[in-house]
Amino acid sequence: MDFAQQHHQATPVLLANVWDVPSARAAAAAGYSALGTSSAAIADTFGYNDGEELSFAELLLLVTRIREQVALPLSVDMEFGYGASVAEVVDNLRALAQTGVAGVNLEDSLVADGERRLVDAETYARRLRAVKTGLEQAGVALFLNIRTDPFLLNRRQALAETVARGQLYARNGADGLFVPCVTEAADIAAIAAAVALPLNVMAMPALPDIDQLTRLGVKRISMGNALHSALQEHLHSLLQNVRQQQSFKGVFSHAGD
């Protein structure tokens, strides 16, 4: 079953979001069927803020190493595409495809002056259609999972805006719809019913469990930066314990597990 087909199963595809080779290897060892990169986790690993402060060259190098070491299908978080022009975005996606990447996330918001803003829906749809056409002309097949951010930005009419954008993107080349920060069951069900694309939601404290998400019509579940953040918190705790307790016992508490 290829990556696109994983989005049309009875149960959602569960993506492990990774940020380096060790995290990708860990996900493979844990039995995951697909991986996705987390832009926030990768940016933090390189010492940047999220929002394309990381260069595409740095991202491509990391993705290449992951692909060389782990055979699972990989979707890359490309944020706004790392290019102002459609031609730049298409060139970047072609470079990713050459590494064997199966898909990408592209989002309809931009970070400028430290603030994230939605791009006009029609403007973004034209950009998406042009990117899709450019890839088709280049003979590049990638699963385009389009992230729309009304819920992430806590917009007043988040549900209606998400549905409208999702339907528009479905007509302009999207293969999937990613709606981060949606957590209410009624909202999830409404989006899944109204938009003819596999629906991707993201792990959140209030997100329903996977069985309920399956019944609501979700087809893809990703983890965002949650794993990376949890590991960083654990690392900070270990470091503090060593200094405060003047002992390394806590560091080796899982040795042999």
Please place each PLM-identified region on the residue numbering.
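Alpha/beta enzyme core
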Residues: 1-76, 82-223, 230-232, 236
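Extended, intrinsically disordered, low-complexity segments
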Residues: 133, 224-257
